[in-house]
Amino acid sequence: MLSRASVALFTTQLSKKPFAIEKPENSNQRRRQATQRNRIACTFRGGDEWLYNLRIMDNKQIARVLRETAQLLEIDGAIIGRYRSYEKAAELIDALPESIEQLVKEPEKLKELPGIGDRMVEHLQEIVKTGDYALRKKLLKKYPATILDLLQLQSLGPKKVAFLWSKFKAGTVADVEKLAKEGKLRELPGFGEKSEQNILKAVEVFKKSTGRFHINTAEDAAAAISVHIKKAGKAVESVTPAGSLRRGKETVGDLDLLVTLADGHTSQKDVDALAKHILEFPGIDQTLAHGENKVSFTLENGLQVDVRLLEKENFGAALLYFTGSKEHNVALRGRANDMGLTLNEYALATLKGEKRVAGRTEEEIYSKLKLDYIPPELRENTGEIAAAEHHKLPQLVTLKDMKGDLQMHSTASDGKNSIEEMAEAARELGHQYIAVTDHSKAVTVANGLDEKRMAAHIKKIHALSEKDLGIRVLAGAEVDILKDGSLDYSDEILAQLEVVVCSIHSYFNLDRAAMTERMLAAIENPYAQIIAHPTGRLLLRRDPIDYDMEKVLEACAKHGVAMECNSYPDRLDLKDVYLRMCKERGVKVVISTDSHNTGNLAFIRHGVTMARRGWLEKRDVINTLPVSEFLAALRPKPGVARTGGRQKKRAAKGD
């Protein structure tokens, strides 16, 4: 394990031609080779190493262009097959480990990918060359680009957006908000008064989210910019993210990067040359500032980046200051003052005479303040300073502690990879077991499995488990919690599942009392074992559902039901505050990815970060256990007891 001083430090090991395409024997080998070749070694929060694929950022940008094309085509009334072809291409490219920028140079190899034909190859070549292509440009002459913002409003789909454009020329969120406030939507076909109110709620969510970015978006940007900065050569000692990204906040407003200057490269001439190099990063949209030791700019997606150039002696103080939070820093400064010291971004020093006491590392600053080192995720002034003073900080869970992933989807429902492919990818990440949890029948939009299909699916998973896959594959399901709190499968099917994950995908707007009763009914079902994405939020898009969390957690503790910390960057659900409540109430937690393709499996690092923010330790998260102990920790089903992971019939009924 790496020292905490190196937490979140990005380092790179790239060859001169890191993206050259070799000739592997098969597609799996090609995927593995590309992943190894294109990854950047990074240090994960808490001292765990993880690998970040640099090219994913470029692929994501290309995927975004295709996805926007699909949305514009659907608004334009194109047939489903046409716009779905662009959606599928976007999904494929988003998850692809190889660089599309390189693959377009070998069109025949590119056409080996499913759904990529001659026309799509031409589109991709044009996008790589110019950043856009003719079809999207044509559509954006017909519709304003802001019309895509309307699809972020939870109550509006492409057909309604198209209708509002044709009738009112409503092409912005402000246009739709005005129509709703004037009561002009409720009389329209397919809308109504309730829909109008939901649109106004969605507008408020949109306004609150403006200027915020998902954690993986900020992480992608930090990695790519760090690689660029390191190319400056000997002048750069290290590049370290700070701010809310380092603290693991669920969304990020801006990005702070600290560049430590190497010995012998601290003159203003060296600093100016490095600043000039930084501002040559190809993704910059606008330069905001260029000072003596700081450059600021915005990226093409609107994310503001502040890069500060530091000498080694000040690195620890600067990292502490710019990591935050503001509340944590204020509390530390108050403590320093009480000890006759002063703390700022340059050093910890004496109040009298300003004699330097510490500043090179965060550890030495905390030590001089008579505190244990406080991990970045805990720095929110919610009791961590008192805990550090009394040596009672938790030993936070780490990525290396994780042994399994308990929510993922295969091609049986809405996943993009087979069970075997998901298992192989999970094994490569170091997992010992996974649960395949395809959707139940109520989620028709996700190709949910009816009881007959699920029974066959369970048998298929059991058959795979007999093979030597190098990883245990558990038969699970993501079972919908229906409006009345009942589960979407019969007891007969639920009894056959090894892992029963329950979640809400409908009726999000029930009142607090009704939603609480719905959740309690699901938890009281003797087959329920895990509640997935428990508040149903979609970050920057949809507010959480409203229920009495105290009552729900009390019921989970009583019945042995675990709460999920969903690692998907759009969700990160449960949030840190509720995870800490779980710990305090003895509620078990699982960290799962909700993966829909093999590339999503690495998202587990985000779930670990949220768990750390919630003060969770290894013992609080049951999928840190080996598979037999994990199965024993799950709520036992009616008539079944577990000993050492083996199921045994019980004489008594119930829990």
Model-identified regions with their sequence ranges:
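Short, low-complexity, charge-dense intrinsically disordered segments
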Residues: 4, 9, 13-16, 29-36, ...
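Polybasic, lysine-rich low-complexity intrinsically disordered segments
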Residues: 17, 23-26, 38, 649
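Charged catalytic cores and adjacent phosphate/nucleic-acid-binding surfaces used
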Residues: 56, 248-339, 344-410, 418-430, ...
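Charged, compositionally biased N-terminal leader segments and the immediate start
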Residues: 56-78
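Accessory alpha-helical DNA-binding modules that contact the DNA backbone or grooves
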Residues: 70, 79-295, 302, 307, ...
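Active-site catalytic microenvironments in core metabolic enzymes, especially phosphate/sugar-handling
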Residues: 476-479, 606
